[in-house]
Amino acid sequence: MAPRAGQRGLWSPLPGLLLLAAALSRPAAPCPFQCYCFGSPRLMLRCASGAELRQPPRDVPPDARNLTIVGANLTVLRAAAFAGGGEGATDGVRLPLLTALRLTHNNIEVVEDGAFDGLPSLAALDLSHNPLRALGYRAFRGLPALRSLQLNHALARGSPGMLDALDAALAPLAELRLLGLVGNALSRLPLAALRLPRLEQLDARVNALAGLGPDELSALERDGDLPQPRLLLADNPLSCGCTSRPLLAWLHNATERVPDARRLRCASPRVLLDRPLIDLDEARLGCSDGDAHESGEGIDVAGPELEASYVFFGLVLALIGLIFLMVLYLNRRGIQRWMHNLREACRDQMEGYHYRYEQDADPRRAPAPAAPAGSRATSPGSGL
């Protein structure tokens, strides 16, 4: 029945509501296989599928912001691996909004040149805990916005040229702020990392650093308003000889740039084993070779702590001496009487000994010798 004139239609809003419900119930694009999506749009994806995942998922939504892959078997990261690159790929999906990429514990051994092409907004990359054996000289190209790079426990198994490759790969990262190189058995720090203009912190703990040379220390200096980078160097086998003088002088002048300066300890020579480096005096560190250096010959171990203890001991002795003099001064009259009485007693004793000596030495007081037995006594006038 048609509605009467002037009467509002009861079913007129129904088509609009149906259209709205259909729009809201429209199924969203599914998550990549073996991944979990969080947020809408998919701000975060987590893929932890085990060893069967051998390459990054190619159907990652283009609006993804964070991507985490843990526990996979991504042995080789080929060029444009996260933009659909790799073997058999002709056209990959770009991820223009991806800002954080975490790839820890994925058994990654090789990172080829341009492995992260197609990620222009990437700001944080974590490759920690992967047995990297080869790193492309341009592995981190195409990452103009990268600010944090974590390579902790990832380079220890690398080839002898790994440090050179790392130097070349880090050079184009002009916006890098944080660099993690913990537990990589590094014998030196990559100079390219130290020269990054905006670097704020370099974490190089638990490595094989025996010290920092003049070239490394000079690369840490910045001119103008650029930030002065901080270093974390704890748990490195530092050699506390004459070669450590530049590092020790730099530490004394820039302690605030090494937050763990008190944890820097000597590993050699033996005489300085486990001594805090910052407590030593660079002028006292001698240079020796071979066994002499190992035994500590030529190295003066009297550091500020020992000198301070000597000064404190001297002050204590001076205080004790001052107290002793004050006691003597306050009791001077009693001490004088005691000395006088002692002198008189000694005099009386000596006079007694002198009197006895005089008596014993007088011959008239000597007794007459006794007559021998059987002899007859005679008088002086008997004539016999």
UniProtKB/Swiss-Prot annotation:
Compartments, record wording: Membrane
Disulfide bonds listed in the record: 31-37, 35-47, 240-266, 242-287
Q: Record's Gene3D superfamilies?
A: Ribonuclease Inhibitor (3.80.10.10)
Enumerate the LRR repeat regions by residue range: 61-84, 95-118, 119-142, 173-196, 198-219
Q: Where is this region: Disordered?
A: 361-384
Q: Which residues lie on this side of the membrane: Extracellular?
A: 31-309
Which SMART domains does UniProt cross-reference here? Answer: LRR_TYP, LRRCT
Q: Which keywords label this protein?
A: Disulfide bond, Glycoprotein, Leucine-rich repeat, Membrane, Repeat, Signal, Transmembrane, Transmembrane helix
According to the record, the segments passing through the membrane are 310-330
**Major localization class:** membrane
Low complexity compositional bias, start-end: 367-384
Query: Sites of glycosylation?
Result: 66
How would you describe this protein's topology in the membrane? Single-pass type I membrane protein
From the UniProt annotation, give the residues forming the signal peptide.
Answer: 1-30
Q: Which GO terms describe its cellular component?
A: membrane
- Which stretches of this protein does UniProt put in the Cytoplasmic compartment? 331-384
According to UniProt, the name of this protein is Trophoblast glycoprotein-like
